From Swiss-Prot:
The organism of origin for this protein: Nephroselmis olivacea
A cellular-component GO term for this protein: chloroplast membrane
Domain of life: Eukaryota
Keyword field: Carboxypeptidase, Cell shape, Chloroplast, Hydrolase, Membrane, Peptidoglycan synthesis, Plastid, Protease, Transmembrane, Transmembrane helix
Record flagged with keyword DNA damage: no
Protein's UniProt name: Peptidoglycan D,D-transpeptidase FtsI homolog
Residues annotated as transmembrane: 20-42
Family: Belongs to the transpeptidase family.
Record EC number: 3.4.16.4
Residues of the active site: S341
This protein's encoding gene: ftsI
Length: 709
């Protein structure tokens, strides 16, 4: 033992780390044996060898034994030193293969952020509870009694479940960490907790129409979660962790890759605060009007970035199983409707562009007009008009929402030219290149999402009669002039209104703002902008060439990410697959035409007797147009009871920044017109936007009764 050696050796021994003390003692013993072997007949007593025992001279046999032991020890020490210095790396790898295993942790999905960087979707740790009865050390009745208060389930129910088999019985999915900790503290053999992250949506029912939801198997089933399902799943590799002899994870030296494996996050254009307020607003409006459903969209006029997309009734994606499946579809971008009078500004723009109508022209409005065998009339909606104004200007046609006036205007345009203009605007096409980056989910069920990887779409964003039918039947062009007989998605209508608001340039509605890298998680304000100019026509770049490119100023007013092509992660590897809202935009209307229409649409709100007067906000310039359209009947023709009311808004009327659309499906009497339903909702919605943007008044505040007096 070490206490048999002198004090100086004992002090050195104690100063050494524990893993070196054994080696030191071995070498000390070997050196002592060698010393004895070399000086066996020394007369000097070596009392420190056997403290407290009389010294005896070594005989020749003992010398040989000790010399042999010293030689063997020296050989072991030499071999140990050789292995330590010459084969350290090789032996370490062998040991690590035995001591370290791979943790097969379920892949977490990427985080989704709103426009300001607030989290709207995230994976949180959760566990699936499995019980293996044949491995349990106590009775099933006792296990059921222990789990009952923790899981808040009856012990009889749990016992019946446990009695179903011998192994692999799943009692509950995605248990939170607190509950799982209580179960672990039970220390019962045969109970297994399998890590299974849970997708959580902190905003609950505010973002459901956009995000969709993720099922218990980790697959996106609606919205962006479905269309970007492959990309949303993290791509990190299994990471090494220390294991015991039975292959169980020890929990020491927990690798950072498991906790912080997220490479990037998806940031949306949606404003969380605005989205929540609008969601509550339209929910109250739906209850007030007794409507079947209602939707509201706010979009930036120049960029196409959607700041708000809310629907009601909604559902909570955290507990989607409690709601009917029809709520999972984001109908403002998938369902077609006949826009009615909200399409009249687009028709007037076509008329102005083709030179068949001037702003000062007056059109005879007789209240009704005969087209073939059919009569078309105006819908008063309770308004009492001055009958002396039978000859209407373009502004008055919009203020009155005159169907007869619009029919007479568009009768001056050749139906074939009219049809070509509609097709040029992207109507009647099943493809949405340069129009919209949304796409229905490829799943077989009715739940819908969008795909930004494939810019073509198999669903119709609008429907127009074919050219032969449109030209041969006069009634087709007549009904199209006031927004009936053709159909489009609400988002497509808003896209056309945005074209008028921004000066005539086509925009692409989009929801994704940028891909945020891990380095920017805590600093989302500063994101570099890059230019796409110079990339067109180039071949696909390797990642090293890609990152070697020098940044250039981005030419569009859009934040698309930290790289020239916004997201290699989403599969946009060549020029053809660049998102359409980053491409060169084409002009649909002249700026002069758009300025004229903006002035007309502003008067629809400013005039106290116009259909949009209830949307007036004192001091703020706003433009818009109401719409009331009959719904098609399943028996053919139009229903006399069901209507869709809507209002498209442009704010501000001078240098517009936003366009809005409120659409209400099947409101009850007396709320059957756009002027007493959608306009009221839009006014409140614009008020929220003014507060959000902190916009000063555009004009001096005036009273509603002082306008046009």
């Amino acid at each position: 033992m070490i206490y048999n050696y002198p004090m100086k050796y004992r002090r050195q021994f104690r100063r050494l780390p524990k893993h070196l003390q054994g080696i030191y003692y071995a070498f000390l013993s070997i050196s002592t044996m060698i010393k004895i072997a070399l000086d066996p007949y020394s007369k000097r007593p070596m009392k420190w060898m056997h403290s407290g025992t009389p010294f005896q001279y070594e005989n020749e046999r003992m010398v040989m034994i000790k010399l042999s032991l010293a030689t063997v020890g020296l050989l072991f020490a030499t071999r140990l030193s050789g292995l330590q210095f010459n084969k350290y790396t090789e032996l370490k790898s062998v040991a690590e293969r035995q001591q370290i295993g791979q943790v097969n942790d379920p892949q977490q999905r990427k985080i989704i952020l709103d426009h300001h960087g607030d989290i709207v979707a995230i994976d949180l740790p959760a566990y699936d509870l499995y019980v293996h009865p044949r491995m349990c050390s106590i009775s099933l009745e006792r296990i059921a009694e222990l789990l009952s208060p923790i899981l808040d389930l009856s012990s009889q129910y749990l016992y019946n479940r446990l009695d179903e088999g011998d192994s692999g019985i799943c009692l509950m999915h995605q248990i939170d960490t607190n509950t799982s900790a209580q179960i672990r503290r039970l220390g019962v053999d045969g109970i297994e907790l399998v890590h299974h992250p849970q997708r959580v949506y902190p905003k609950r029912g505010s973002f459901e129409s956009i995000l969709g939801y993720v099922d218990t198997e980790g697959y996106g089933q609606a919205g962006l979660e479905s269309s970007l399902d492959d990309w949303m799943k993290s791509t990190y590799q299994d990471v090494p962790c220390w294991m015991d002899g039975h292959g169980n994870f020890l929990g020491i030296r927990f690798p950072k890759q498991i906790l912080f494996h997220q490479e990037s996050a998806l940031q949306l254009t949606i404003d969380c605060g605005l989205q929540e307020k609008v969601s509550q607003l339209i929910t109250n409006a739906m209850n007030r009007f007794g409507a079947k459903r209602i939707a509201a969209i706010i979009m930036e006029a120049h960029s196409g970035a959607i700041r708000c997309l809310a629907t009601s009734p909604s559902y909570d994606p955290n507990c989607y199983g409690w709601f009917p499946m029809e709520r999972f579809r984001c109908w403002p971008i998938t369902d077609l409707f006949e826009p009615g009078s909200t399409f009249k500004p687009v028709n007037l723009a076509i008329a102005l562009e083709n030179g068949i109508f001037q702003p000062t022209d007056r059109i005879l409005d007789t209240g009704k007009i005969r087209i073939g065998d059919s009569w078309i009339g105006n819908v008063g909606g309770g308004f009492i008009w001055d009958r002396s104004l039978d000859h209407l200007t373009g502004t008055q046609i919009l203020q009155r929402s005159s169907n007869v006036g619009m029919v007479r205007v568009m009768q001056s345009l050749d139906p074939a030219i009219y049809h070509r203009n509609l097709i040029r605007l992207g109507l009647g096409s099943h493809r949405n290149d340069n129009q919209t980056s949304f796409k229905m989910s490829s799943h077989d069920h009715n739940e819908s999402g969008w795909n930004l990887k494939d810019l073509t779409s198999d669903y119709a964003i609008s429907v127009v009669k074919d050219q032969d039918e449109f030209v041969d039947h006069e009634i087709e062009a007549a009904t199209a002039s006031f927004g009936q007989g053709l159909a489009m998605t609400p988002l497509k209508l808003l896209q056309l209104i945005a074209t008028i608001a921004n000066g005539g340039m086509a925009v692409t509605p989009h929801l994704i703002s940028k891909i945020v890298t891990l380095d920017h998680f805590h600093h989302l304000q500063s994101m570099n902008e890059f230019s796409l100019q110079g990339w067109v026509g180039q071949s696909v770049l390797s990642r090293s060439q890609y990152h070697a490119k020098q940044p250039r100023p981005y030419t569009h007013d859009l934040y698309l990410g930290h790289v020239p092509v916004p997201s290699l992660e989403l599969g946009w590897f060549d020029v053809k697959s660049i998102p359409p809202h980053t491409r060169e935009r084409r002009r649909l209307f002249s700026r002069q035409t758009c300025n004229v229409l903006l002035g007309m649409l502003e008067q629809v709100v400013l005039d106290a007797q116009a259909t949009g007067s209830r949307g007036f906000l004192p001091g703020y310039a706003m433009a818009g147009k109401t719409g009331t359209a009959q719904k098609a009947s399943a028996l053919g023709g139009y229903s006399t009871d069901s209507v869709v009311t809507s209002f498209v808004g442009i704010y501000p009327a001078v240098k517009p920044k936003f366009v809005t659309l409120v659409i209400i499906d099947e409101p009850e009497d007396p709320f059957r017109f756009g002027f007493n339903t959608a306009v009221d909702v839009t006014q409140t919605l614009i008020s929220e936007m003014i507060v959000q943007e902190q916009d000063p008044p555009s004009y001096p505040t005036v009273s509603l009764f002082e306008r046009n007096m």
